[in-house]
């Protein structure tokens, strides 16, 4: 016990035990303990009475704390069950989440006064943030279809949004043409808790390096990528692309790599640790609007498209990349720079891309007002087109995907179809934003 307690804590415990035994007239036990615990004669009857009741108080206090912990654990389990039940996952609606694709919209949110440029889902709650050229951010309950609040702070159009931060302390990051990045705290009614300054031109995109991380990545038309520690507000690294405008940035799932795309028509792959470019993806004939790393769940399909005999290990986070551009095409790449497929079908600028968490589909939006779904298991064939909005579709995001749903490498990862799949724990919900000033939810 004395190895766990400090000397003063141990002394207090010994005296409390002696005082308790004295109060119940166990005099022989008191004498033995005084000798064994080496409590000197200065601890007389008057001092002993000051310690009476202390042991009982601590004992009952521990019992109350144990009961409170059990009650809180039970309450937490109940809330988690309620959350899992309320959230309209494909599983809860009897659908197959691996093959789920959006159909008609469930909600249409209309409150912005100008084009919606970006959307982002809260990782835990049914909250959705949308940013607009009207310089505001709006927070919606996408489950109930209600507007919760409007955030004002940016002086020019909001360019991008992302939720992140350490577990239990989620932060919303926003960026704008006003050259600033703002951090908003959902736990404080979305108060603007910090403003990050440093870019010399419009900030195009923000992404947290990992879902539960304090590191934020920003990309700008000043041709730089900045890495920020949101807990301090300091810029910890600047990467100079030595090129032109950067329109988009996307981190790999482990946070070790970045892909950027912009005005020079090339996508670049960067190693975060060294801040060096490791590959250039050259092939588009106009500005690149969006870029994203493929999840490991899609590796087997992309490996087949690339003509590889075996898929890369699922533990690798940066094997394949998709880019979309103003040349109306989507290109699929090996991250080392080899073009493996060009997807043609959109009739206008491609503005947003995401991979289905199940790995089978790539979903895109464009200024042709549509959402298009491409089946990677069929070589990237266009299998579905949805007329999503009445004007340009500017952005798309998938609902929260638990980190545990990203597969890990096993010895059979390239042989077993079971190990290649993602556990269907993700929510099948998509949000889009449009130049028609609306946000739509597809479930």
UniProtKB/Swiss-Prot annotation:
Dimerization mediated by the LisH domain may be required to activate dynein. Self-associates. Interacts with nudE and dynein. Residues 9-41 form the LisH domain. GO terms for cellular component: cytoplasm; microtubule; microtubule associated complex; spindle pole; transferase complex. Residues 60-87 form a coiled coil. SUPFAM superfamilies: Lissencephaly-1 protein (Lis-1, PAF-AH alpha) N-terminal domain, WD40 repeat-like. GO terms for molecular function: dynein complex binding. It comes from Aspergillus niger (strain ATCC MYA-4892 / CBS 513.88 / FGSC A1513). WD repeats lie at residues 111-152, 154-194, 198-238, 241-280, 283-343, 345-384, 388-427, 429-443. CDD domains: WD40 (cd00200). InterPro entries: Dynein_regulator_LIS1, G-protein_beta_WD-40_rep, LIS1_N, LisH, PAC1-like_LisH-like_dom, WD40/YVTN_repeat-like_dom_sf, WD40_repeat_CS, WD40_repeat_dom_sf. It is found in: Cytoplasm, Cytoskeleton; Cytoplasm, Cytoskeleton, Spindle pole. This is Nuclear distribution protein nudF. It holds the Pfam family LisH_PAC1. Its main location: cytoplasm. Positively regulates the activity of the minus-end directed microtubule motor protein dynein. May enhance dynein-mediated microtubule sliding by targeting dynein to the microtubule plus end. Required for nuclear migration during vegetative growth as well as development. Required for retrograde early endosome (EE) transport from the hyphal tip. Required for localization of dynein to the mitotic spindle poles. Recruits additional proteins to the dynein complex at SPBs. GO terms for biological process: cell division; establishment of mitotic spindle orientation; microtubule sliding. Keywords: Cell cycle, Cell division, Coiled coil, Cytoplasm, Cytoskeleton, Microtubule, Mitosis, Repeat, Transport, WD repeat. Transmembrane segments: none annotated. Belongs to the WD repeat LIS1/nudF family.
